[in-house]
């Protein structure tokens, strides 16, 4: 009986881990030899509202958003290590654009990561990165906790895509 519970637990953890990794389309090979990538983050839906509506509802959002983006990029960079740095590098030839499709009231994120060239054409993408948010706290605290786990998941998926591409 214990053996069956162990196998079921292992299978569940494997499925959850695969769900967080997303699907890779295209190749991240153009990032070979690059040390820096510009970063952009767009929030499509927060707590069932557009970002503009959420800004009206949560008046501090425009002040807090840079911190949330910083938490996300720190998570990405921690997973990437020294191989590549993601941040505000407008002169970099490539941009990693994260489209946050939704942030739930618990801080769960669903996002896509797109690699764009200098002309903003899509080269590659990682679709459907799903992560869990926070456990307790204010709405902003849950969004920040979710940004940290989403950043780590994005960094992990990006690192795997780079490894597959040979970087």
Language model regions located:
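Surface-exposed short loop/turn segments
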Residues: 22-23, 79-144
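Bacterial Sec-dependent N-terminal signal peptides
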Residues: 1-24
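A structural "domain/chain start" motif
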Residues: 19-70, 160-167
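C-terminal/domain-edge helix-coil "capping" segments
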Residues: 21-34, 122-167
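Negatively charged, low-complexity tracts enriched in Asp/Glu with abundant Ser/Thr
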Residues: 39-41, 70, 74-86
């Amino acid at each position: 009986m214990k053996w069956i519970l162990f196998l079921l637990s292992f299978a569940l953890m494997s499925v959850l881990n695969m769900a967080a990794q997303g699907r890779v389309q295209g190749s991240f090979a153009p990032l070979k030899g690059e040390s820096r990538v510009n970063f952009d983050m767009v929030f499509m839906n927060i707590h069932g509202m557009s970002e503009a509506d959420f800004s009206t509802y949560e008046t501090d959002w425009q002040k807090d958003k840079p911190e949330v983006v910083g938490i996300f990029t720190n998570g990405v960079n921690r997973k990437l290590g020294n191989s590549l740095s993601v941040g505000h590098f407008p002169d970099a030839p490539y941009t990693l654009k994260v489209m946050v499709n939704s942030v739930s009231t618990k801080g769960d994120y669903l996002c896509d990561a797109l690699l764009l060239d200098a002309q903003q054409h899509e080269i590659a993408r990682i679709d459907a990165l799903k992560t869990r948010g926070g456990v307790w706290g204010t709405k902003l605290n849950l969004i920040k906790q979710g940004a940290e786990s989403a950043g780590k998941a994005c960094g992990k998926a990006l690192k795997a895509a780079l490894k597959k591409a040979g970087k």
